[in-house]
């Protein structure tokens, strides 16, 4: 078993699927992001590590803490929401043939 002592944050993951926005609260995460967001980018750099097999995908939006129950995707942007990031990459990390955590972020 792998121990993640720095994974002490709760985040809310949002994913647009068709016309719906799925929401999932993930506990026991490592989440660090830059406060600065430029108007040209509308994006902030971050890294998220979530122990477990729940999939994270590029394009998912990650909110620091427990986020709103419902959001309007086109208005729920990192430029307007402190603590919100959008994943540019996401990848599973495996150990002994099993997914032990997912890493997502933007560099």
Residue ranges and their predicted role:
Residues 1-49, 79-82, 86-107:
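N-terminal disorder-to-order initiation segments that are Gly/Lys/Arg-biased
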């Amino acid at each position: 078993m792998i121990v993640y002592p720095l994974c002490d944050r709760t985040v809310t993951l949002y994913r647009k699927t068709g016309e719906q926005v799925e929401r999932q609260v993930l506990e026991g995460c490592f989440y660090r992001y830059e406060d600065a967001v430029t108007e040209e980018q509308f994006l902030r750099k971050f890294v998220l590590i979530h122990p477990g097999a729940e999939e994270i995908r590029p394009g998912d939006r990650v909110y620091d803490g427990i986020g709103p129950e419902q959001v309007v995707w086109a208005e729920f942007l990192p430029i307007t929401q402190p603590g919100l990031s959008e994943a540019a990459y996401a990848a599973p990390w495996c150990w002994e043939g099993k997914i032990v955590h997912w890493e997502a972020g933007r560099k």
